């Protein structure tokens, strides 16, 4: 595959203009064991997960993790079982207590809060959606959705109105008086989404919410998350073991292994420039033309473009640009805004497509 004249930089920190991150994580550790706090900062902390467990009986869940999530971003954390991804999302709200490190939500230090402030933050600023729906079987849909508002102390009329709005938002109008056991798995997860949204949180966190659903229902729920994000614009942290799900949902993806960050990047960065063999294996089956943008396949502009050459943006997906490029009589101009950054022709496009077919 032809690369650009200037290989795109990896997005190790959040995009943006210096605004306060929605989520800021710095130097986060979680070690399970009775002397966990004594290990941080010692030579033992440099041992591999296996070596540390063999020598001390302690297990590293998360090792020195740092990242930012921008306001409004869908940030996906993925990895295989045991990679630490579910531990990480629980550390963000201190459902599991960190051994060391800092977590902030919109500038507020979660790791420094007392129990009262932490409880208030969980009630008002963060909502979580888990794989297991956790619906109350004796409550109707609308009352399940309103439950968090009830715990928060809001009046019955106010919380019922808000709950009905969220029921309608997630496409369950007409089911508000049904009980959970009268709903399909996908519908129950929609109730979970509505309940999470009802509190109007600043950050939504998802821990593999769709992994137990049938493939078609899972796809529908992924599309529902995309639609809801477009409508409400919430910051989302999404945990998954499924690369296809990560590529579909994520603005950026953090890949974990053995409690450590392996790579952070946009979907096209992860597929186009995998950090190591672990990531390369993850992405080997991905149809690259569906993920890579033109900046990954374009060549330097040599100055011989036709005046009427088609113009394409550098962040356009190869698959979406293919018809225009293949129908053009010569190379197409690739721009970043108004600046020409390269050219692309049919050979560049076909090189990606042929590589997929020969995989």
Name each model feature, range by range.
Residues 179-183, 187:
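Conserved ABC ATPase signature
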Residues 198-202:
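A short, proline-enriched helix->beta-strand linker immediately N-terminal to the Walker B motif
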Residues 307-330, 334-339, 344-359:
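The conserved cystathionine-beta-synthase
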Residues 264-265, 273, 343:
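ABC ATPase "signature
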Residues 93:
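Helix-to-loop junction immediately C-terminal to a conserved catalytic motif
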Residues 24, 41-51, 108-109, 150, ...:
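Conserved ABC ATPase "signature" region
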């Amino acid at each position: 595959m032809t690369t650009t004249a200037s290989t795109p930089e990896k997005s190790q920190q959040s995009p943006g203009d210096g605004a306060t991150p929605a989520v800021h994580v710095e130097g986060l550790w979680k070690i399970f064991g009775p002397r966990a706090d004594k290990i941080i900062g010692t030579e033992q902390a440099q041992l591999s997960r296996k070596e540390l467990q063999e020598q001390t009986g302690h297990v590293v869940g998360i090792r020195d993790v740092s990242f930012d999530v921008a306001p409004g971003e869908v940030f996906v954390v993925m990895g295989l079982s045991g990679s630490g991804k579910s531990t990480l999302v629980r550390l963000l709200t201190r459902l599991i207590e960190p051994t060391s490190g800092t977590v902030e939500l919109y500038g507020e230090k979660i790791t420094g809060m007392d129990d009262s402030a932490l409880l208030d933050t969980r009630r008002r600023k963060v909502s979580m959606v888990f794989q297991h729906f956790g619906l109350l079987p004796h409550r109707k849909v609308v009352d399940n959705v309103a439950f968090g508002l009830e715990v928060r102390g809001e009046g019955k009329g106010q919380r019922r109105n808000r709950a009905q709005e969220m029921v309608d938002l997630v496409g369950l109008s007409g089911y508000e008086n049904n009980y959970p056991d009268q709903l399909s798995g996908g519908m129950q997860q929609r109730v979970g989404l509505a309940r999470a949204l009802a509190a109007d949180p600043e950050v939504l966190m998802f821990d593999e919410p769709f992994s137990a659903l049938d493939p078609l229902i899972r796809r529908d729920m992924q599309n529902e998350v995309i639609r809801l994000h477009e409508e409400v614009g919430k910051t989302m942290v999404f945990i998954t073991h499924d690369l296809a799900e990560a590529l579909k949902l994520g603005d950026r993806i953090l890949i974990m292994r053995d409690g450590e960050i392996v790579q952070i990047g946009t979907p096209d960065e992860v597929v186009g420039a995998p950090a190591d063999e672990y990531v390369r294996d993850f992405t080997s089956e991905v149809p690259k033309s569906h993920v890579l943008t033109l900046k990954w396949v374009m060549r330097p502009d040599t100055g011989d473009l036709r005046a009427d050459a088609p113009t394409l943006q550098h962040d356009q997906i190869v698959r979406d640009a293919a018809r225009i490029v293949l129908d053009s009589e010569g190379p197409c101009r690739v721009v970043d805004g108004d600046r020409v950054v390269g050219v692309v022709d049919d050979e560049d496009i076909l090189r990606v497509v042929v590589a997929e077919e020969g995989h």
